[in-house]
């Protein structure tokens, strides 16, 4: 995500300045729509990373709380592979659903940009 702002064509910023648009308007109408896919990708990466991390969650829950990934590992250790596979499959489906929602949102931004380009 660090390199994306450097990839945005400087002529967009110059055009905004020549049209006397303020900094806030330039950010909200030019930069943020272009950065939206990168921001959503970073959110997806962070979400997947957070879901799969057990150690950080240990500090946030009580001893009675069951974390899905820890529960799956306990089922494997106890030899209950069927239960572990079922819970793992559910976890994968939930994560994929959230990723597809983010992908759909990114697709919407691509579609709206191409529509705007065709109208111009």
Swiss-Prot record:
The keyword Transmembrane applies. SUPFAM superfamilies: MetI-like (SSF161098). Keywords: Cell inner membrane, Cell membrane, Membrane, Transmembrane, Transmembrane helix. It is a multi-pass membrane protein. InterPro entries: MetI-like, MetI-like_sf. It holds the Pfam family BPD_transp_1. The keyword Transmembrane helix applies. It is found in: Cell inner membrane. PROSITE patterns: ABC_TM1 (PS50928). Its main location: membrane. GO terms for cellular component: plasma membrane. Residues 1-38, 103-120 are cytoplasmic. One of its GO terms (biological process) is transmembrane transport. Belongs to the binding-protein-dependent transport system permease family. FbpB subfamily. A severely truncated paralog of the AfuB uptake protein, homologous only to the last 20% of the intact protein in Actinobacillus. This is Putative ferric transport system permease-like protein AfuB. It comes from Escherichia coli (strain K12). The gene is afuB.
